[in-house]
Amino acid sequence: MDAAGEIQKVASMRLGGSMRGDSGSMWRRGDDVFSRSSREEDDEEALRWAALEKLPTYDRVRRAILPLGGDDGAGDGGGKGVVDVHGLGPRERRALLERLVRVADEDNEKFLLKLKDRVDRVGIDMPTIEVRFEHLEAEAEVRVGNSGLPTVLNSITNTLEEAGNALGILPNRKQTMPVLHDVSGIIKPRRMTLLLGPPGSGKTTLLLALAGRLGKDLKASGKVTYNGHGMEEFVPERTAAYISQHDLHIGEMTVRETLAFSARCQGVGSRFDMLTELSRREKAANIKPDADIDAFMKAAAMGGQEANVNTDYILKILGLEICADTMVGDEMLRGISGGQRKRVTTGEMLVGPARALFMDEISTGLDSSTTFQIVNSLRQTVHILGGTAVISLLQPAPETYNLFDDIILLSDGQIVYQGPREDVLEFFESMGFKCPDRKGVADFLQEVTSKKDQRQYWARHDKPYRFVTVKEFVSAFQSFHTGRAIANELAVPFDKSKSHPAALATTRYGAPGKELLKANIDREILLMKRNSFVYMFRTFQLMVVSLIAMTLFFRTKMKRDSVTSGGIYMGALFFGVLMIMFNGFSELALTVFKLPVFFKQRDLLFYPAWSYTIPSWILKIPITFIEVGGYVFLTYYVIGFDSNVGSFFKQYLLMLAINQMAGSLFRFIGGAARNMIVANVFASFMLLIFMVLGGFILAREQVKKWWIWGYWISPMMYAQNAISVNELMGHSWNKIVNSSASNETLGVQVLKSRGVFPEARWYWIGFGAMIGFTILFNALFTLALTYLRPYGNSRQSVSEEELKEKRANLNGEIVGDVHLSSGSTRRPMGNGTENDSTIVDDDTEVTQRGMVLPFTPLSLSFDNVRYSVDMPQEMKAQGVADDRLELLKGVSGSFRPGVLTALMGVSGAGKTTLMDVLAGRKTGGYIEGSINISGYPKKQETFARVSGYCEQNDIHSPQVTVYESLLFSAWLRLPEDVDSNTRKMFIEEVMELVELKSLRDALVGLPGVNGLSTEQRKRLTIAVELVANPSIIFMDEPTSGLDARAAAIVMRTVRNTVNTGRTVVCTIHQPSIDIFEAFDELFLMKRGGEEIYAGPLGHHSSELIKYFESIPGVSKIKDGYNPATWMLEVTTIGQEQALGVDFSDIYKKSELYQRNKALIKDLSQPAPDSSDLYFPTQYSQSSLTQCMACLWKQNLSYWRNPPYNAVRFFFTTVIALLFGTIFWDLGGKVTKSQDLFNAMGSMYAAVLFIGVMNCTSVQPVVAVERTVFYRERAAGMYSAFPYAFGQVVIEIPYTLVQATVYGIIVYAMIGFEWTAAKFFWYLFFMVFTLLYFTFYGMMAVGLTPNYHIASIVSSAFYAIWNLFSGFVIPRPRVPIWWRWYCWACPVAWTLYGLVVSQFGDIETPMEDGTPVKVFVENYFGFKHSWLGWVATVVAAFAFLFASLFGFAIMKFNFQKR
């Protein structure tokens, strides 16, 4: 009997045995029952293993023994059986994991030890990787000073210069900036390495270099080897996993789907081969493994599974099970939290088989306990299974720091220390620096090499302190025993023969091409389902347009009696082709939005580009049938096209091919452009060329010989020819109207009048061309994604000082003042000694002398504050009866001048809510209770003038410098009587205080893209508020997302601010000991919006600890433990339930509460001789000054925005030259109607395309600035009108230049009549048309929540404006029920003005004897006498859209708080 039969027999024995056992069981003695049943089970288990072992090895590794049945999947009541692990369902996988790793914290280590034990028993070595790097150097090319600022002028000169460099005719003015300098070291397997270093020290560059992922924008030298093998000998991307600090994921996929897809692409590595060998050796040694471990290893080693048990395991150890089936989300789609997203980024690489991990800042947004759990799980994996890991962390808590074996400390691109964690303090003590008792070692290491922080750690009081440079540390480390040991080890090359054959990956991809294609197909289907709204909206949009088209070109109004009426049918066909083409436009955005994730996965070698591009094409075909069907089926017979059913289906078939071609074209453009602004411009450009040379706007005979090649390669030409031939060669047109010598049918006459080939075969030529273009564009799309790199976001420019300092640090020279941070002028943060304080300020003058500008210290007290919102519909649906949800429940407290208060609590406690209520930033909800400012009731108008609010998201205009941001804030927020010089002195003082002097001319940039780092951005946020000279400052999480040193810099800024006598309140999340103890008082809240402690912290948090330890049952704090962490742990809801207490009640019965109440009462009474805050006007500055300031900032922003302005000028100039050459000399002579149509075609195409380009490209610019506007308006800087004024007015000069450049080039080349009046009329209409298009785009942003919706809303009107412009169908031929819209369509008025100003007064007769003027009046309905009115209406449209933008900005606030 074969082995499979044996397994069947075992299963039947199990069934029969159980029945027999049941019948006799009642007669047995109790103890015998248990002994028999367990004996029987053992026998059956043995039989199963025996049967399993008889299987061939290949089959044996695919099958495992698992519990069967049971409702919970745990196998209860179902017995065990042999299962094919390839088909394990979610329930079986979950049950298996539940048995192996029930609680990740407790069971993971035991589980890994079982895995290791199984492998060790048969003597299999696990592959390990030792990474060595020797003399690693990296340099970046940067522009120094102002030449690096991205102004329109710089962008043009820099582009020309780079072209000159490439040709070798111009010298390279860029300078090199060192990033890494001569770093060498060894990363050992089975050891956890922590990478530390201040911001900009080169941590990311080092990790990228070690992972073999260094970009081509850096000049690198040196050697990195894995087990002695150079990078070229294996595939580093698959051997090592680099986990980026940027979280790039597809928002529409769930966490589980994201990880499962990643696991599918990365494959299982050598797991299957190892398992086969393991199984063979176990069989030979007659070893029976643990059934669950066997099942897990087999399931994890199977490639090609849609869901792998390893994915479920990673979800568990990363704590992502709770959100496994939640969408990841993005800025448009609500999803998981930032911390969870960070863990998904980590999990995405952990599910793969890589044995070396390089992890960049994986703890951002995570609380310390989650970080500890993740790092601990990684540590267990590395130690037990022999992995290699280098992890950089921002603010590791002491308990997380202690999990690491080795430390690498980087500073200024050099390794200051590398080696065992235990020896690091010894090294620094040998240099004279000591870590204080209450200081985290990681925090100490990040600060000890910094000029500003070093002095406080100097421990040799017998010697005077002298700044020790990084170079001195580096050379001292080389003679330190750890440094010598590393140098000695590096001197002996790694023995390549000792490298495990499975350690290094040599195949390019982790799975076969067929499997990767299948994975991408499955993902694309999933995304199409999730994005179904886009396709439904697209279809709906097409339906709406088809309804307009069929009622506009209505069959009762459509005659077949002349060539002119045939032209109207041609217009209807042209419009149909254009709409089907435009329908594919949304592919552009869908492609570009997915590219960042694609590039990440491509570069990690998840899959080749072809496996991504094929599904994105093939799977869209079924949708095309629906979309095109909707248009053709609705319009064909209603418009009255040829009644032959064959012609109908041929039109449908051709439209399908056109839609496929258009979708492929836009996918290719998106893939080649890789950026939404460039893609939009490029797509508009391609559409324009294809359209103008497509044979409808300009007849073939009129195309100049130098452009005829463009006619032959235009897909629109083939589409237009094919669809025209299909209609006009049909039965309905097969009649002779005006008998001519040739007796041509009417259809042929119409085709010839428009220059179309009157041959039936052109239908199939056109159809074949559409298929050919579709294949070509998809091939080009694949090539673009295979070879193009994403745009770099590296810094292109640095200041002269920064470069000088970088170079000086390399040489060990000292630049600038070092003794910035020695003594202390405030209460020390640590144990009271001077050396212990991190957040200090040596400059006694700054804190003691007061600022240049005086301010009035103010206190803020609040009593019984309640805040509620309308009950969310989801909660009402769950049966909650209340109408309101209360978020703050009677909170009372006070904040005083010169006192730094921390506002803390777990997530959901209401910290930010309370701060928003007190600061008056809430845009909805219901507020009750009293809030007083120095005893007077708070009035929001005056309060905004004396308060500052530093938001958690650092929102600033990206195109201005640090100094300009501060100047703008001070200009609008300081009183009018402060003169310009005093204002500038005050800004200088604030920059000194906030340590921004070195960044004075740095561009702010966009977060995560370019410009300032997170920590610099935080300091700018604080400075922007400080220059307003406020008395009260609110700060929302000023240290989140920062490393320890950056957080210390920010906190030093905050402390300096308090020392000037201001009232400062900060919400803070998971602070380190020294940051926490920098605060004077704490206001602690619990979930649900109630306070549980409000009072002083005391020396070493003694007051806080005393208060909570006095509550019965609360556990005592351990020595050296962070009081902030302890406090949050002992006050959780779980603790309340365990102790049976309510911390809020305890607080309200305490003596502390009574003291606080008395203080609130005291602060609620105005001081004698004081007066309430009063300002004569709502804003500091007059409306005129506000307008000037807003215009000043917009001017800077626009000048420094080349992607917007330089691209628009370039695009306009190129189009002007193209139009000039295409329509060369066609405007001068009008001898027949086609000449007029050609000239009008040039006007129509330019107006529509340049106008639409202006409209789409302004939207992202306005959307970014609007976010800044919300913050600045809330801060009381200006009203809505000055902002709208600045945004509108700054467009005028740029549009004027754009229209003038276009007008001069085109007017001269097309050869319109050279009279001053006609030229200036032409210019006038172009200027105001481009303005109203631009203002229309701005208005769409103003009326919608974000720019994605704005682009959808605005694009809905493009098609309608196109249709009613008067070119496709002239106004007199429009049915009466639609004629009103001809007067409401701005483009129709523009064409009216342009045509009538050029041709409306020409009396010269055409070939048929009709004067041009009469033809214009009869055919188009354009009268020259109306010219003045037309001009007024066109200008009025610009004014109307600008006014609506201003109105929308004033009335709508889409920011929900």
Swiss-Prot record:
Domain ABC transporter: 164-437, 860-1112
Subcellular location: Membrane
Membrane protein topology class: Multi-pass membrane protein
Domain ABC transmembrane type-2: 515-728, 1185-1399
Top-level division of the source organism's lineage: Eukaryota
Residues bound to ATP 1: G197, P198, P199, G200, S201, G202, K203, T204
Binding site for ATP 2: G905, V906, S907, G908, A909, G910, K911, T912
Residue numbers spanned by region Disordered: 14-43, 821-841
Protein name per its UniProtKB record: ABC transporter G family member 36
Function recorded in the entry: May be a general defense protein.
SMART domains in the cross-refs: AAA
Family of this protein: Belongs to the ABC transporter superfamily. ABCG family. PDR (TC 3.A.1.205) subfamily.
Positions with biased composition (Basic and acidic residues): 28-39
Lineage: Eukaryota, Viridiplantae, Streptophyta, Embryophyta, Tracheophyta
GO cellular component: membrane
Keywords for this protein: ATP-binding, Membrane, Nucleotide-binding, Repeat, Transmembrane, Transmembrane helix, Transport
GO molecular function: ABC-type transporter activity; ATP binding; ATP hydrolysis activity
SUPFAM superfamilies, per the entry: P-loop containing nucleoside triphosphate hydrolases (SSF52540)
SS bond list: none
Record Pfam families: ABC2_membrane, ABC2_membrane_7, ABC_tran, ABC_trans_N, PDR_assoc
Transmembrane segments: 533-553, 565-585, 621-641, 653-673, 677-697, 706-726, 765-785, 1209-1229, 1244-1264, 1292-1312, 1319-1339, 1349-1369, 1380-1400, 1429-1449
